[in-house]
């Protein structure tokens, strides 16, 4: 809240009750009375003050929420959208994709895909229903799901596959050869985010581009992923990685490595970062 009563709205990505406690007990006193336009200084102040416990998880989510509020406040004070403060528009429109298509009976899955197709979507992301504990039968069922969606959306549209950390390296290496024929744009989070060597190995296969970063919490974490060529698409969320201040730097870093950024979730803070990158 500014002296004149203008308010900035932030957003906590996960565990909002716990994040609020962290903000109230540790973070808010670091920024109260400060100039919001000193956002770089404020970000560094929060980061260094919580380094022992806050570099990932709740601490960084709290920093993200405050930083998003600061940028929203700056935009309102200057009467400009945040993307203009970041350098302005770089594109006329932001491409979007339909992101649901969870595991369900084949007919229902195809009806849902047809619905998105009729709504005008050209890109689709779907989920799997089975993992390592389900063995070869689970692999077969997963393939049937992908085939069902491809039958509806065709090969002129993009299809992305989301495993949501549900596999391990061994399982991923078994199923990927079965998925190649469906020409997916990417395979998202096949293994847990801590298995960076697994991401490196899968991405180096070159069979299907690997996407990740939804559960990464820092600029330095993405720097590590990019240096190791662990992913072909990065998917940060500004309300997890340190807000607009960190997200803008991650965009620049990804440009250096020529790796596309596809932010996680269609939330306003991610739209502004995408419009300015």
Specify the residue positions occupied by each region the protein language model found.
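Metal- or metallocofactor-binding catalytic centers and their adjacent structured scaffolds
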Residues: 6-77
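Glycine- and other small-residue-rich loops at beta-strand/loop junctions that grip anionic moieties
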Residues: 12, 63, 101, 135-138, ...
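Metal-dependent enolase-superfamily TIM-barrel catalytic cores that perform enediolate-based chemistry
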Residues: 93-205
């Amino acid at each position: 809240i500014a002296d004149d009563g203008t308010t900035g709205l932030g957003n906590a990505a996960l565990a909002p009750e716990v994040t609020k406690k962290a903000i109230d007990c540790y973070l808010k006193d670091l920024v109260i009375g400060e100039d919001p336009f000193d956002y770089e200084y404020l970000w560094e102040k929060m980061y260094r003050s919580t380094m022992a416990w806050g570099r990932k998880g709740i601490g960084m989510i709290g920093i993200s929420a405050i930083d998003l509020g600061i940028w929203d406040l700056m935009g309102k004070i200057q009467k400009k959208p945040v993307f203009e403060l970041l350098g302005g528009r770089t594109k006329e429109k932001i491409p979007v994709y339909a992101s649901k298509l969870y595991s369900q009976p084949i007919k229902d899955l195809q009806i849902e895909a047809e619905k998105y197709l009729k709504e005008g979507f050209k890109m689709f992301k779907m989920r799997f229903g089975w993992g390592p504990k389900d063995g070869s039968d689970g692999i077969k069922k997963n393939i049937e799901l992908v085939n069902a969606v491809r039958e509806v959306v065709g090969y002129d549209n993009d299809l992305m596959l989301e495993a949501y950390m549900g596999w391990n390296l061994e399982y991923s290496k078994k199923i990927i050869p079965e998925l190649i024929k469906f020409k997916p744009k990417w395979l998202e989070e096949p293994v847990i985010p801590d298995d960076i060597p697994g991401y490196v190995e899968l991405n180096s296969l070159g069979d299907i581009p690997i996407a990740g970063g939804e559960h990464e919490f820092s600029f330095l974490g993405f720097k590590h992923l990019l240096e190791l060529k662990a992913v072909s698409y990065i998917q940060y969320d500004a309300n997890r990685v340190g807000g607009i201040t960190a997200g803008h730097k991650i965009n620049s870093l990804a440009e250096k490595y020529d790796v596309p950024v596809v932010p996680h979730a269609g939330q306003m803070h991610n739209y502004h970062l995408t419009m300015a990158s």
